[in-house]
Amino acid sequence: MDNENPAHAGWRLARENPKLVLLEVAWRWSFGILALLLLGWAVASVLHRVTISDADWVALRSLDLHDTPYTLAKIIILFWQDLLLVFATLLSALALAWMITATWGRAATLRILEGRSNTPAVAGLNLLRVLLFIVTLLAAVFAVEGAVWLSTPSAADPAELNWALYLLIVLIALPLIMIAWGILNWVLSLAPLFAVREQKGAFASLAAAFRSLRCNRKVYWSVSGVYGLYRGAALVALTVMGLLLAVLSQSKIVLGLLLALLLLYFAFADLLYVARLAAYLQIVEGQLPALQLPAAS
């Protein structure tokens, strides 16, 4: 297996270690269940704090292109303080839940692959991912608000918004922000491999991840492309089967089948994630000596 490429090696390791997949499913689905419970709490809290009239309920349920957005905007404007408090609490709780489950899950999977772990460094890297998400969210909000400000000729009359300029700014700024977030988040997800192998802290592991990407970017992109293609094909298959089932019938049985297909897709996506992680580990193991910084003389 010396000539085995990283993508094939990762797939083989995932198949030979079903416990890896079970651990990945366990932590991701645990977070998913916690997220649903927290979302349910947020909805209940909003309904308790916000008074919605019968007419507003009718407008919200109608899904009318004019009445529904108008009613929703009116509710947000009237109760923005309560909604902001609930949103901030929900976001904080989700971040904490994700940090705990993700740190436990990644430390456990790497312990199987490497025989050891580095939980403090993994937790630090996950904290950086949470902070990156918050910064990205704020950047998106500022981009939208900045687009409104730049597209309004007169501050006294916001109705004079230049929609063409507004859309141009938003459609350029938001994709750039998302691309930057995607790249940095991916590097942060790669860094735990170096935290475990080199037993270093979060920032040293992050620096090692950047060095590895600089030396082996083609191999990393190749592995990511292979598993991205698999996941894309699975998503297309899920969409096609879901549409076919929806066209054939709208019974509860079909709804149950759709839910089962969705869960199957999530499980397959977790399998692919573990295989990709193992493939990245093969790259790291093959290049580790070249990544060490020279000792200071």
Where are these regions (language model features)?
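Cytosolic-side membrane-entry/anchor segment at the start of a transmembrane helix
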Residues: 13, 17-29, 34-41, 114-144
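Residue-identity detector for threonine
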Residues: 51, 68-71, 89, 101-103, ...
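Non-cytosolic segments of integral membrane proteins
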Residues: 139-160
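Hydrophobic alpha-helical transmembrane segments of integral membrane proteins
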Residues: 101-103, 107-142, 211-230
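Alpha-helical membrane-spanning segments of integral membrane proteins, especially the hydrophobic core
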Residues: 79-95, 115-141, 162-177
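Hydrophobic alpha-helical transmembrane segments of membrane proteins
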Residues: 93-104, 108, 270, 274
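Juxtamembrane transition segments at transmembrane-helix termini in multipass membrane proteins
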Residues: 2-9, 15, 19, 23-78, ...
